[in-house]
């Protein structure tokens, strides 16, 4: 099939007059229920004239996009019934929430899920009343909506979620409505390229439906105003075959849309049939639909002398004063009665039988499709024993390794054992992040042209790489929401590109947890590497650890942040995260050569606790003895610098009782009243004391540690070092010095904070200042760090040899 192939308006119609009449009535029923949800408190079937008490005092909702969504839904039901198709519906214009609720109700799913809202007049009254009403449901296609995997509040992610749902679902078709406003967003523009990653043999299909109703909130849309030939050329350039449906006469549009959907589904079947018949898999040209209908179609044409239907004025509530303005109320009643509710519902308020017969049944209903409640389909990963990948550690700090390279061997075998339910996403960084061992079990999925020098590209790869963090996260979210597992690996600084996507996913999870009918899904797992302390070669643009702060702002029951200090702890944490459900897990780990501290048994015990005293690095060892100072650390580089500082202190001040505490699970720092992983006060005080100085070396921005610990008894004695936005292209040790996180500055902090040391150890303090100057001078002269610093390792000493 040629990329130049184009189809415009389909000829003919597969609908008989009877079928057309029924589909039109079904559409009218959905529109009626949609308007009722926006406006009505009572009198759902208009058994009496509308009065002020029948109308909501606050009108909230969006009408403009809703009739278009309802139109597509009605016609997809016909496709599902006629072809026994497995279809879910993703609505980019999620503000058309009343439409999706209406259709779930018409199919009977809503009453099955929410048993108090029956299919009768009283059920209709409750359905209408709850919409955008205190104690009710939100205005968008949120998690409360049966059949939804995409809320559509923040625009841009519909298409990428749809493709994520289709991956590894060979018999699923994801119909995805894209609003012409949403089409102006960056993620959506990139999302068109997802077809280059869709394997027609092993994946399902996505049917994009570009809804051109012409307007956003208050402005025209770009794609609706360019010449149609230019629009078609754009879509063909993306690799699609557009089929256009256009008009404002319902009868004509029904006939066009029925023909267009038949043509599109025939095209999908032909593509998949050819690909699955054997032979080389090539990238096909998938069909899509361009749907041009008026915004606010079937609503008021004119309100207060101004055009509404077909304009931006129909975006939200076309009649805004129906509670207090009799003219608006009369116009609302006329609007509602125009749908002929007596033709759609019987006297008891039930959808008439001939219309109910238009909806699919059971799991084929889009509102009841198990793919849209992915936890129903979720199977545990078949995970290898992570202990088999352990880094041998005979004594702490004596072995050098690359933590993410170690993890890559584990992930290789995770992929090998779960080829139908696990994918790894990365924005062209998987090899850079030293995870390339995975290519021993899989390739990178790629259906476009290849060149002889390309490596690891294949149509059926498990790794997905595209230089768009939005696509990586969106694909993974769609994959998870439909019952699968995955991992998103990313440079730490650039994961900020998807900050708002994380926000939206967290909101979805929070709501889903409150809905007993929504089953738990696999956690959204981030692996952040190439992190702030080892981006000395790329400079300030690549140095930002603030994603942790964003995650920490989210609801405690959803978020977990892990900072494993070495490869064995990283393996333990990764295994835990891949087994978890309904969380957002953030793992921050280094990729550069670094010291390994814990053997596997010790790593498992340490990660299980989440934090703990490293006895082998401490000099405060006597039973019952209080330390003079606590050196705490979280993150691989802060751990290195803390241990180096402890090494200096034990040599220079052998009588100083130092306790080293390492933190893997950052949320352990909070009280147990604030986070499920939080430490009770008595346990926190036992580790960090109630009155001794705590010098805390932290991977990210220092203020987060203060936020997490501000209720602790010893907070006034807590002094945190971390990233202070001092960065450039320099050496690794110069980076930590720029931010006062280096070993010499940590020693200075101890001398300044422990009572009596300032004067007694004045010479040591001066030597630390001199050591910092010397280290910086060395970099300026040689262009690298002093080998004595760069090659430092932990050596046993008499005072802590018992545990070594």
UniProtKB/Swiss-Prot annotation:
Q: Does the keyword Signal apply?
A: no
Its top-level enzyme class, in one word, is lyase
Single GO BP term: carbohydrate metabolic process
Q: What is its EC number?
A: 4.1.2.-
Entries under CDD domains matching the protein: TPP_PK
Task: Name the cofactor(s).
Answer: thiamine diphosphate
For this chain, one GO molecular function annotation is: magnesium ion binding
- Signal peptide region: none
Return the InterPro entries for the record.
Phosphoketolase, THDP-binding, Transketo_C/PFOR_II, Xul5P/Fru6P_PKetolase, Xul5P/Fru6P_PKetolase_C, Xul5P/Fru6P_PKetolase_CS, Xul5P/Fru6P_PKetolase_N, Xul5P/Fru6P_PKetolase_ThDP_BS
- The source's superkingdom equals Bacteria
Which NCBIfam families does this chain map to? PRK05261.1-2, PRK05261.1-4, PRK05261.1-6
**UniProt similarity note:** Belongs to the XFP family.
Q: What name goes with this protein?
A: Probable phosphoketolase
């Amino acid at each position: 099939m040629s990329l130049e192939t184009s189809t415009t308006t389909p000829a003919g119609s597969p609908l008989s007059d009877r079928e057309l009449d029924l589909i039109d009535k079904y559409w009218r029923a959905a529109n009626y229920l949609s308007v009722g949800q926006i406006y009505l408190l009572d009198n759902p079937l208009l058994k009496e004239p509308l009065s002020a008490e029948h109308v909501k005092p606050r009108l909230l909702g969006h009408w403009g996009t809703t009739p278009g969504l309802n139109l597509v839904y009605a016609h997809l039901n016909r496709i599902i019934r006629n072809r026994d198709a497995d279809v879910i519906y993703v609505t980019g214009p999620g503000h058309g929430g009343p439409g999706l609720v209406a259709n779930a109700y018409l199919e009977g799913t809503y009453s099955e899920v929410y048993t108090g809202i029956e299919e009768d007049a009283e059920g209709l009254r409750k359905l209408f009343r709850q919409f955008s009403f205190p104690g009710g449901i939100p205005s968008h296609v949120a998690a409360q909506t049966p059949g939804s995997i995409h809320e559509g509040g923040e625009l841009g992610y519909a298409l990428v979620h749809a493709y994520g749902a289709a991956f590894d679902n060979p018999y699923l078709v994801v119909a995805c409505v894209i609003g012409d406003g949403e089409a102006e967003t960056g993620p959506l523009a990139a999302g068109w390229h997802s077809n280059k990653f869709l394997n027609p043999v092993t994946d399902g299909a996505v049917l994009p439906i570009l809804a051109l109703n012409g307007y956003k909130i208050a402005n025209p849309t770009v794609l609706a105003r360019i010449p149609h030939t230019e629009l078609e050329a754009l879509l063909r350039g993306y690799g699609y075959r557009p089929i256009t449906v256009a008009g404002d006469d319902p009868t004509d549009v029904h006939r066009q849309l029925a023909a267009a959907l038949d043509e599109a589904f025939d095209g999908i079947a032909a593509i998949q049939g050819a690909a699955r018949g054997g032979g080389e898999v090539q990238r096909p040209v998938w069909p899509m639909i361009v749907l041009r209908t008026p915004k606010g179609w079937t609503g008021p044409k004119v309100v207060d002398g101004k055009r509404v239907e077909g304009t931006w004025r129909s975006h939200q509530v076309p009649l805004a004063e129906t509670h207090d303005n009799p003219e608006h109320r009369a116009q609302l009643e006329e609007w509602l009665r125009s749908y002929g509710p007596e033709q759609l519902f019987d006297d008891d308020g039930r959808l008439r039988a001939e219309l109910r017969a238009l909806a699919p049944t059971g799991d084929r209903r889009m509102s009841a499709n198990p793919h849209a409640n992915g936890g129903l389909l979720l199977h545990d990963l078949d995970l290898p024993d992570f202990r088999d990948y352990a880094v041998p550690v005979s004594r702490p700090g004596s072995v050098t390794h690359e933590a993410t390279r170690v993890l890559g061997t584990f992930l290789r075998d995770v992929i090998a054992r779960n080829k139908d339910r696990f994918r790894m996403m990365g924005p062209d960084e998987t090899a850079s992040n030293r995870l390339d061992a995975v290519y021993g079990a899989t390739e990178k999925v790629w259906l476009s042209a290849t060149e002889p020098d390309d490596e690891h590209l294949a149509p059926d790869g498990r790794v997905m790489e595209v230089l768009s963090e939005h696509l990586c996260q969106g694909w993974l979210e769609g994959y998870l929401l439909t019952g699968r597992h995955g991992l998103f690996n990313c440079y730490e600084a650039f994961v900020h590109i998807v900050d708002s996507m994380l926000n939206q996913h967290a909101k979805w999870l929070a709501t889903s947890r409150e809905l007993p009918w929504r089953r738990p899904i696999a956690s959204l797992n981030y692996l952040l590497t190439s992190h702030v302390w080892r981006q000395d070669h790329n400079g300030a643009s690549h140095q930002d650890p603030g994603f942790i702060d964003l995650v920490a702002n989210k609801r405690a029951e959803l978020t977990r942040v892990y900072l494993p200090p070495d490869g064995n702890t990283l393996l333990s944490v990764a295994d835990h995260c891949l087994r978890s459900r309904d969380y957002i897990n953030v793992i921050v780990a280094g990729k550069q050569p670094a010291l390994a501290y814990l053997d596997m048994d010790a790593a498992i015990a340490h990660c299980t606790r989440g934090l703990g005293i490293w006895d082998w690095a401490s000099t405060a060892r006597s039973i019952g003895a209080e330390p003079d100072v606590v050196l705490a650390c979280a993150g691989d580089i802060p751990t290195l610098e803390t241990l180096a500082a402890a090494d200096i202190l034990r040599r220079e001040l052998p009588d100083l009782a130092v306790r080293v505490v390492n933190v893997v699970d950052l949320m352990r720092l909070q009280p147990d009243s604030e986070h499920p992983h939080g430490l009770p006060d008595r346990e926190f005080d036992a580790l960090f004391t109630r009155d001794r100085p705590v010098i805390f070396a932290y991977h990210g921005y220092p203020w987060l540690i203060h936020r997490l610990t501000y209720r602790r008894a010893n907070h006034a004695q807590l002094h945190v070092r971390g990233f202070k936005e001092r960065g450039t292209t320099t050496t690794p040790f110069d980076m930590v010095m720029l931010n006062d996180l280096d070993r010499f500055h940590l020693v200075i902090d101890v001398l300044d904070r422990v009572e009596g040391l300032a004067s007694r150890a004045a010479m040591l303090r001066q030597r630390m200042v001199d050591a910092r100057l010397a280290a910086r001078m060395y970099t300026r002269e040689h262009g690298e760090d002093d080998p004595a610093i760069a090659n430092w390792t932990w050596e046993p000493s008499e005072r802590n040899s018992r545990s070594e």
